[in-house]
Amino acid sequence: MDFKGESKKLELYDFTTVADELDVDSAALRAVLTVETGGSGFDAAGRPKALFERHYFYKFLANQPDKQVEAVEKGLAYPKWGEKPYPHGSDAVYAEIDAACEIDLNCALRSVSWGLGQIMGNNHKMVGYDDVQDMVKDAMESELKQLRQMAAFIKSAGLLDELQNKNWAAFAKGYNGPQYEKNQYDVKLADAYAKFA
């Protein structure tokens, strides 16, 4: 799969538009984007910023043992998060994604966090897509579509109140998982918000 689309960048008013739709401070929304991806949804090659989660790939291949064994042998899957470090650089990440897609396209795309908000492909239904490939195609098209995916996830995951109230610890736990404190995700959100407020 070619992961290059139109790669349209956000306009400043896009933040305000989506923030108004969510009824949140645009600085709070920008803080999340800054912590997740540095505020940019595309890499230098015009592909959506992505992170391949090998432990999810392992999990999603559980009912396909031959594929799971192949993925493990190729270093693309393992049972627990953190067993191996993430690859450095977007090209290395996409090399893993491409290799995983050759094993199982759907499971591979579901195992990646995509774009500005780093929304897991497995959450495609939560953000309004019947098919993960459609979610990825929209992420390839524009940062605005990536931002809308993030907004839909925030609403679907029940995190809107936390973002509106700038309850960074509760938001971080819901958005980034129970390990958020390990990386000081809540502190990073508060610091980023202070820069934009």
Regions found by a protein language model. Give the residues of each.
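Catalytic glycan-binding domains that act on GlcNAc-containing polysaccharides
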Residues: 1-197
